[in-house]
């Protein structure tokens, strides 16, 4: 267990501190250069876009924590490898959101350590309950994240092409993660659990938009 805990602890520190590096190119770089669309945003639009991207950044901090907690207690090595691979892609999302926040002259959430700790505890609990439940938790989480990102694509300023490109790629990745979890044997979670997850998500997104 210790040989897995130490690398995960290092990853946790990097996620909370925002010291992450993407393994894939930022999808926004294929759309428009960083300085090109900033002038098109009013100050109100910039603050709104930054609030949404801060929420997305928090979501990726939580995703890192959830996957790390689940992988730590996964019983099947193949499931652990699947969770680790998804976490690496989520780390790309984390780096892209952090870069976009810098471009929008804003900052990540001040509550990131709290978000991470809570999400890790939930992920560890899901992992301890068994791989099928853990995968079901992944599938339901990604389904809710997909819905959340669709909403952000509707709410982002129309001409904020860079944020839109990042969110669109994140959405595609989340859909795939959810499909993979279901294909690997994830079970449907009870409705009260799904409702509790939605409530927790609303609390997080409301706070992260501002703080």
From Swiss-Prot:
It is a peripheral membrane protein. It is found in: Cell membrane. The keyword Transmembrane does not apply. Belongs to the COQ7 family. This is 3-demethoxyubiquinol 3-hydroxylase. GO terms for biological process: ubiquinone biosynthetic process. CDD domains: DMQH (cd01042). One of its GO terms (cellular component) is plasma membrane. It catalyses: a 5-methoxy-2-methyl-3-(all-trans-polyprenyl)benzene-1,4-diol + AH2 + O2 = a 3-demethylubiquinol + A + H2O. Fe cation 1 binds at residues 60, 90, 93, 174. It holds the Pfam family COQ7. Its EC number is 1.14.99.60.
């Amino acid at each position: 267990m210790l040989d897995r805990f130490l690398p995960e602890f290092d990853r946790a520190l990097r996620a909370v501190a925002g010291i992450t590096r993407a393994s894939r190119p930022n999808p926004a770089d294929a759309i428009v250069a960083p300085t090109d669309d900033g002038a098109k945003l009013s100050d109100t639009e910039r603050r709104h876009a930054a609030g949404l991207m801060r929420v997305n950044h928090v979501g990726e901090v939580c995703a890192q924590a959830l996957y790390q907690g689940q992988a730590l207690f996964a019983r099947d090595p193949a499931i652990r490898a699947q969770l680790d691979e998804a976490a690496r892609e989520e780390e790309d999302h984390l780096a892209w959101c952090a870069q976009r926040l810098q471009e929008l002259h804003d900052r990540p959430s001040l509550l990131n350590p709290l978000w991470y700790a809570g999400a890790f505890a939930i992920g560890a609990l899901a992992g301890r309950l068994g791989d099928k439940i853990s995968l079901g938790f992944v599938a339901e989480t990604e389904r809710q994240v997909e819905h959340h990102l669709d909403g952000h694509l509707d709410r982002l300023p129309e001409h904020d092409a860079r944020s839109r490109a990042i969110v669109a790629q994140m959405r595609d990745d989340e859909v795939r993660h959810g499909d993979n979890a279901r294909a690997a044997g994830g079970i449907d979670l009870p409705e009260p659990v799904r409702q509790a997850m939605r409530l927790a998500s609303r609390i997080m997104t409301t706070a992260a938009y501002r703080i």
